[in-house]
């Protein structure tokens, strides 16, 4: 256990569940920054179509999210290759589901409602962040009994 976690554990209301949410927000924040900065670079610097930029941002942020969530948020231990494969395929499968939601909301906001690309990306990230937490907490990284 890290020294920071030991200090935080001295706070009476700081439970494992609070820690999990706190760490998810921290790692989710980094993941969101990676996603938005990658999207911004691809759309505003490279002048790529927002759908391509969104896909590249998705790939970069999901790779970061898998390893950071596994280690720092859910402290997931998978002893066998079968467990690792199940966990990884579940993670990437649910992230593909939220990517579909992400791209559909982006198309709706940008193409039909004329929302600025960067603002649309920020709003879709909020939706995806909540969905990803729910999927990760209760399905992907659930504690094995």
Swiss-Prot record:
InterPro entries: GtrA_CellWall_Glycosyl (IPR051401), GtrA_DPMS_TM (IPR007267). It comes from the Bacteria. The keyword Transcription does not apply. It is a multi-pass membrane protein. The chain crosses the membrane at residues 21-41, 45-65, 91-111, 122-142. One of its GO terms (cellular component) is plasma membrane. Keywords: Cell membrane, Membrane, Transmembrane, Transmembrane helix, Transport. Its main location: membrane. Involved in the decoration of cell wall teichoic acid with galactose and glucose. This is Cell wall teichoic acid glycosylation protein GtcA. It comes from Listeria monocytogenes.
